A protein has these predicted regions:
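Solvent-exposed beta-strand/loop surfaces of large extracellular or lumenal domains
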Residues: 1-9, 26-32
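C-terminal beta-rich recognition modules with glycine/proline-rich loops and embedded aromatic residues
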Residues: 15, 19-127
Length: 127
């Protein structure tokens, strides 16, 4: 390989199998974009992924552990995170509990396929 190219002499009947395993990347926006401050987006290949709530009380209660591995499985990305759980009161003097959970991200282009869960592309992180 040289300069990003691979050169190979082949003769017929040669079969070439290519397997590209795209890596998951964390994307950070400029800090001047206030709505995305302290948040990341996930991409794999050419796709951007959106976080699903999966029964969590709110998309805002979920936080991604950006230091843990992110696994590609069945077309989705799975990652460790936390879900903030509080009581029924809107305000309290006790902090909410941060319960470990698995976060599920689906390709953004599939986000409107039948589910009514809340979704977010830009997700809070533990950083």
């Amino acid at each position: 390989a040289k300069d990003g190219y691979y050169v190979q002499q082949i003769t017929a009947p040669t079969i070439l199998d290519f397997c590209f395993a795209p890596t998951v990347r964390l994307l950070y926006s400029n800090a001047r974009i206030g709505a995305n401050a302290g948040r990341v987006a996930l991409s794999r290949g050419g796709l951007i992924y959106a976080l699903e709530t999966q029964g969590a009380p709110s998309i805002h209660a979920l936080t991604l552990d950006s230091k843990s591995p992110i696994v590609y499985q069945d077309g989705c990305l799975l990652a460790a995170g936390t879900c903030l759980q509080g009581g029924d009161h809107l305000y309290t003097t006790a902090p909410p509990k941060a319960v470990p959970c698995t976060l599920r991200f689906i390709p953004f282009c599939r986000r409107l396929n039948g589910k009514e869960d809340q979704m977010a592309v830009w997700v809070r992180t533990t950083d």
